[in-house]
Amino acid sequence: MLKKGKLYIIGDSYSTFEGCIPEGFAAWYFSGGTDVTDVTEKTETWWHMLISKTGMPLLLNNSWSGTTICNTTYDGAYCPDTSFIGRFDKAAAELAKNPPEVLIIFGGTNDSWSGAPVDSLQWENWTDEDLKKVLPAFCYLLCRIKQVLPKTQTAVIINTELKPEIESGMTAACEKQGIEYIKLENISKQNGHPDKEGM
């Protein structure tokens, strides 16, 4: 059960919608739709349905299509400005001043699709090289969230069809940190992304 209060989202394409994410961030879902999805309105997205049902005010939807949790993206490119960990660190000071009651993390899909190095769980002494790898970066993200937002309820959504080692690693990391997680099952998708039914 989620707390009542302000919601903050860190996500990838699955959580985007044109005009609902920071300026300059890439979206997957657009008003009026595209030929790759049947989602045409923001009211059809999972996050908008959540805030409509709960009445939670959305502090920010910090979601960027195509982004990874770690600092490695497609073609092995280094991406500290777009990664989940980079975006959280950039937002950390402001979040500490105006903390959300609930933070939802929905990522790992592009880490899986891009072929970013996975490695294993690591809970301290991260180097720049460590943060180029999926599971060390995910552990770093969870630790930073607890450090910056100790009173915020954090929940992680784990997608279907991830690499098994990413899915199991994210699950184990959440369990170790006592962070709630939701594992999706058999959701309907078009072109690898949730459609109306899958939302």
Please annotate each region the language model reported.
Residues 5:
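Nucleotide donor/acceptor-binding cores
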Residues 8-10, 104:
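Structural motif
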Residues 10-11, 157:
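Short hydrophobic segments within beta-strands
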Residues 14-15:
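Short active-site segment of divalent metal-dependent hydrolases/proteases
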Residues 20-119:
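Conserved SGNH/GDSL esterase-like catalytic core that processes O-acyl groups on lipids
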Residues 78-197:
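Alpha-helical cap/lid subdomain in secreted, periplasmic
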